[in-house]
Amino acid sequence: MARRGKKKGRPISGWVIFDKPKGMGSTEAVSKIKWLFSAEKAGHAGTLDPLASGMLPIALGEATKTVPYVMDGTKVYRFTVTWGEERSTDDLEGQPTKTSDKRPSREEVEALLPDYTGVISQVPPQFSAIKIDGERAYDLAREGETVEIPTREVEIDRLEIVGFPDADRTEFEVECSKGTYVRSLARDMGRDLGCYGHISDLRRVEVAPFTDEDMVTLAKLEAVWPPLPPKDEDGNVIEPAPRRDFSALDALVIDTGAALDCLPQVPLSDDQAQRVRLGNPVILRGRDAPLEADEACVTTRGKLLAIGYIEHGQFKPKRVFTAG
């Protein structure tokens, strides 16, 4: 039987709440963060278009097991709609497909906002990651195909105007559910206002439970990144190579358990924690310990240990984290 190769990188776990710059793709961002931290594993919790900037939560190591909880979290975006043009991609990158000389007043835009609050139906953009018969919609669109993308329901908790710099542009902030396409919002509002519109600026400022205060820029990460050992002209590391000190960089990592604020969290004693590490259930003690929960997590010494469920006051682990 073939032996599994040794993983490359450090076994670091946690969340890097990356302030992605414009022009960088989400996959590129993950690769960059993984390289900076020399991490064994990394993944993101929700694609952010290259045109967009802002929050891209990136999980390292065992935190990748908690990605679904962050992907389900509420998102907050700030965006600018430029009126008068609808574009093929519903943002600046596309070609104009429809134009109008009309420009909406602030009052007209404000009157429309209630129609885009609550549970609404929207069709994702032609240039999106939606799969159609096993292929990405954006791949089909690049080949010149116009595809039928099913309507989906999304939830808009809040949509408000935050700026009206001139007649051509309106600035918004939206708080919305997973799966909401802000580009579709701009397109549909433009159609309803009879003037067309597209996204000209987009920034994600929140992915629950993380906030803008958690974000770190590439410049901040690179400023504390430990340099690689020097090499000779043949590309070989010059020995003795100094040990790289990642402590300043690792200080910017948020604990894995922060992604699970939506779940009941119960601290365990050292003895209980050891039982859970072995996959065994434990009786939860304490006045505030829950008796029942479809999903919950337990911690040890302030660190996430396991996700599971609680039945008759007993925690039963489903996923144990070795970093705990």
Swiss-Prot record:
InterPro entries in the record: PsdUridine_synth_cat_dom_sf, PsdUridine_synth_N, tRNA_psdUridine_synth_TruB, tRNA_sdUridine_synth_fam1_C, TruB_C
Region (Disordered): 87-107
EC numbers, comma separated: 5.4.99.25
GO molecular function terms listed in the Swiss-Prot or TrEMBL record: RNA binding; tRNA pseudouridine(55) synthase activity
Active site, per annotation: 49 (nucleophile)
Alphabetized UniProt keyword annotations: Isomerase, tRNA processing
Gene3D superfamilies: Pseudouridine synthase
Catalytic activity: uridine(55) in tRNA = pseudouridine(55) in tRNA
Chain ranges passing through the membrane: none
Top-level class of the enzyme under EC nomenclature: isomerase
GO BP terms in the entry: mRNA pseudouridine synthesis; tRNA pseudouridine synthesis
Domain of life: Bacteria
Pfam families found in the cross-reference section: TruB-C_2, TruB_C_2, TruB_N
Paired cysteines (S-S): none
Family stated for the protein in its record: Belongs to the pseudouridine synthase TruB family. Type 1 subfamily.
Function field: Responsible for synthesis of pseudouridine from uracil-55 in the psi GC loop of transfer RNAs.
HAMAP family for the chain: TruB_bact
Identification of the protein by name: tRNA pseudouridine synthase B
